[in-house]
């Protein structure tokens, strides 16, 4: 499980040093792809393969499923961390997420999210106050 927030920097080649806590789970390979809210999702290869199998179950006649798969998979890039725990974030994905140098790497359970640091901070400023004001459970039985 991926937990916590880390604030590394991308180097001049667009490489990210994975947080040490995440490396063991990503050592055998990972997939970086477009996420929602203009972040990137990073999945361990096995988790991505499981998700892909679920996506394949959607009927080809379902336009929303086709659209989602196109957007999600067309930006996907499989990567293998080097000995220093670095992975290259492809230029297409860096542009999509507005990544320059300062980034936030957040644990989101079964996935890691990669955000531009300022965008992440703005997102938290907007969403976090409402977190405590919820009258109903967002995740029934959990919170």
Swiss-Prot record:
Its main location: cytoplasm. This is Transcriptional regulator MraZ. PROSITE patterns: SPOVT_ABRB. Belongs to the MraZ family. It comes from the Bacteria. GO terms for biological process: negative regulation of DNA-templated transcription initiation. Forms oligomers. Keywords: Cytoplasm, DNA-binding, Repeat, Transcription, Transcription regulation. It is found in: Cytoplasm, Nucleoid. GO terms for cellular component: cytoplasm; nucleoid. One of its GO terms (molecular function) is transcription cis-regulatory region binding. Residues 5-47, 76-119 form the SpoVT-AbrB domain. InterPro entries: MraZ, MraZ_C, MraZ_dom, MraZ_N, MraZ_sf, SpoVT-AbrB_dom, SpoVT-AbrB_sf.
């Amino acid at each position: 499980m991926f937990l916590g927030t880390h604030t590394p920097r991308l180097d001049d080649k667009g490489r990210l040093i994975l947080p040490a806590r995440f490396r063991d789970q990503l050592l055998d390979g990972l997939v970086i792809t477009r996420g929602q809210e203009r972040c990137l999702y990073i999945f361990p290869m096995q988790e991505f393969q499981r998700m892909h199998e679920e996506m394949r179950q959607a009927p080809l006649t379902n336009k929303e499923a086709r659209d989602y798969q196109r957007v999600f998979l067309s930006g996907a890039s499989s990567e293998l961390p080097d000995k220093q725990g670095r992975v290259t974030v492809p230029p297409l994905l860096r542009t999509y997420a507005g990544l320059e140098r300062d980034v936030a790497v957040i644990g989101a359970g079964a996935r890691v999210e990669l955000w531009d640091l300022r965008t992440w901070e703005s997102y938290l400023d907007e969403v976090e106050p409402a977190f405590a004001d919820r009258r109903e459970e967002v995740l029934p039985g959990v919170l």
